[in-house]
């Protein structure tokens, strides 16, 4: 499977660029009245009602609730430091859980990588989506920083998905396009045609 893209739409603005349509939209606590075709939605577990095309999201403090939930797909937001024996035991019984790896560590790359390696050590095969948060107002700055944060994880073959969250003044379309661009640059998912010039004659 190609890596998935999760996009933030907690502000209720659900419009997407057809060329860069995310696989999942994280809507937080409110499902929008108008949903995009072909997109599945993620809601916080305590407000999720089992609507078609929606899935619950849990945090690591909600393990008992997650174990009782009968959804076929669940998302677990979890930092590396929360990877306790209890969490590992729960994941071994719930292969349907997608882990959304979070980090506030100065070395985010190292902590994301450590989480995946710990899962491997425990023999777990749950998919891992990397959550990367920024506060950028300039598209180029977002592209550079997010590509640097994600590049090594992609080339190491550790990336099952990407979730870019930006609190700056950039449109959702820019953030979505950045996520797809990173995956295309890593040769893990193609979303647009690339034109490459011949190094000899310059023709495309």
Language-model-detected regions and their locations in the chain:
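Catalytic cores of alpha/beta
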Residues: 13-17, 86-90, 110-114, 137-154
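Short hydrophobic alpha-helical runs that function as membrane-insertion/retention elements
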Residues: 26, 129, 161-164
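Structural signal for hydrophobic packing residues in well-ordered secondary-structure cores
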Residues: 29, 70, 91, 116-123, ...
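C-terminal helical cap(s) of enzyme catalytic domains, especially alpha/beta-barrels
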Residues: 35-42, 168-188
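General structural feature for long, well-ordered alpha-helical segments within catalytic domains
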Residues: 18-21, 108-115, 146-149, 171-179, ...
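Active-site beta->alpha loop and helix N-cap motifs at the rims of alpha/beta catalytic domains
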Residues: 1-110
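Small-residue-enriched alpha-helical segments and adjacent helix-cap loops
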Residues: 111-116, 120-137, 174-177, 188-204
């Amino acid at each position: 499977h190609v890596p998935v893209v999760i996009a933030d739409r907690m502000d209720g603005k659900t419009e997407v660029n057809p060329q860069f349509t995310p696989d999942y939209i994280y809507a937080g606590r409110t499902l929008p009245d108008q949903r995009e075709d072909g997109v599945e939605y993620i809601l916080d577990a305590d407000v999720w009602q089992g609507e078609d095309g929606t899935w619950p999201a849990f945090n690591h403090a909600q393990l008992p609730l997650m174990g009782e939930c009968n959804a076929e797909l669940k998302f677990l937001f979890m930092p590396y430091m929360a990877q306790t024996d209890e969490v590992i035991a729960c994941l071994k019984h719930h292969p349907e859980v997608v882990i959304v790896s979070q980090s506030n560590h100065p070395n985010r790359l190292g902590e994301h990588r450590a989480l995946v390696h710990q899962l491997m050590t425990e023999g777990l095969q749950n998919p891992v989506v990397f959550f990367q948060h920024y506060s950028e107002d300039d598209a180029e700055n977002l592209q550079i920083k997010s590509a640097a944060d994600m590049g090594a994880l992609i080339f190491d073959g550790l990336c099952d998905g990407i979730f870019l969250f930006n609190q700056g003044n950039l449109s959702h379309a820019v953030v979505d396009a950045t996520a797809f661009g990173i995956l295309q640059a890593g040769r893990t998912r193609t979303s647009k045609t690339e034109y490459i010039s011949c190094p000899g004659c310059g023709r495309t």
